[in-house]
């Protein structure tokens, strides 16, 4: 692209050919009448601050383009028609099935299942329902006479208690004697060598 002093790059700015306009260009140049009509109807802004409101609208407009839905959206009326038709068909087939013998019905079901499984496999959503693993508690029995005396639970008649209460737990090894060296007391409230009064 040749650039002289006077040629601004506007003529041929897009290196990919003018096929793709930027979103901003599209917003400002395309469908002006539509935009004006949209501006005319007055909506109460979410933010009182103008700049924030503009920003919010722009973000909303951007988000409207990215959609994560893979299936084509269908109109409500269509889906309801289809559903009612489906229901009617099911009822009709059910009433017909009652008269038939069970075995032929079973055969037919197996045949149809084998045929339709390929079709169904693709339609199932990729995120299947995975329940969290169930935690099962098993209660282990402890012979109660051992258990009651030790844990200090309430003693009921009929359970033997231990002949004498368990001895005091031994002192930890380090302080069986006086600790070997006590540093200089820092004269704080807790550490002072004498009580604080």
Curated annotation (Swiss-Prot):
Keyword presence, Transcription: no
Primary residence: nucleus
Annotated Basic residues bias: 58-75, 84-127
Region Disordered, residue ranges: 1-136, 158-197
Expression induction: Transformer protein is only present in females due to sex-specific alternative mRNA splicing of tra pre-mRNA. Female-specific alternative splicing of tra pre-mRNA is controlled by Sxl, which binds tightly to a characteristic uridine-rich polypyrimidine tract at the non-sex specific 3' splice site in one of the tra introns, preventing the general splicing factor U2AF from binding to this site and forcing it to bind to the female-specific 3' splice site. As consequence, only the female-specific transcripts are translated, while non-sex-specific RNA expressed in males is not translated.
Biological-process GO terms, alphabetical: cell differentiation; epithelium regeneration; female sex determination; female sex differentiation; mRNA splicing, via spliceosome; regulation of stem cell division
Gene Ontology CC entries for this record: nuclear speck
Biased composition, class Basic and acidic residues, residue ranges: 1-17, 24-39
Keyword set, alphabetical order: Differentiation, Nucleus, Sexual differentiation
A molecular-function term among this protein's GO annotations: pre-mRNA binding
Keyword Lyase listed: no
Entry-linked Pfam families: Transformer (PF06495)
Compartment list: Nucleus speckle
Comp. bias intervals (Pro residues): 163-172
Entry function: Member of the regulatory pathway controlling female somatic sexual differentiation, regulated by Sxl. Activates dsx female-specific splicing by promoting the formation of a splicing enhancer complex which consists of tra, tra2 and sr proteins. Together with tra-2, plays a role in switching fru splicing from the male-specific pattern to the female-specific pattern through activation of the female-specific fru 5'-splice site. No known function in males.
Domains: entry comment: RS domain directs localization of proteins to the speckled subnuclear compartment and the purpose of this localization is to allow colocalization and co-concentration of components of the splicing and splicing regulatory machinery to permit relatively high rates and/or efficiencies of reaction and interaction.
Protein name: Female-specific protein transformer
């Amino acid at each position: 692209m040749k650039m002289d002093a006077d040629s601004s790059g506007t003529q041929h700015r897009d290196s990919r050919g003018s096929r793709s306009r930027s979103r901003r260009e599209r917003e400002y140049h395309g469908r002006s009448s539509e935009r004006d009509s949209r501006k005319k109807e007055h909506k109460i802004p979410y933010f009182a601050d103008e700049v924030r409101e503009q920003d919010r609208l722009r973000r909303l407009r951007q988000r409207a383009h990215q959609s994560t839905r893979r299936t084509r959206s269908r109109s409500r009326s269509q889906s309801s028609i289809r559903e009612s038709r489906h229901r009617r068909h099911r009822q009709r087939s059910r009433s017909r099935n009652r008269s038939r013998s069970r075995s032929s019905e079973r055969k037919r079901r197996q045949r149809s299942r084998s045929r339709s499984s390929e079709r169904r496999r693709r339609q199932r959503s990729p995120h299947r329902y995975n329940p969290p693993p169930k935690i099962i508690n098993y209660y282990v029995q402890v012979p109660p006479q051992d258990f009651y005396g030790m844990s200090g639970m309430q003693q009921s008649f009929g359970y033997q208690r231990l002949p004498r209460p368990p001895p005091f737990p031994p002192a930890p090894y380090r302080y069986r004697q006086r600790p070997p060296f006590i540093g200089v007391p820092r004269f704080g409230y807790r550490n002072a060598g004498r009580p604080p009064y």
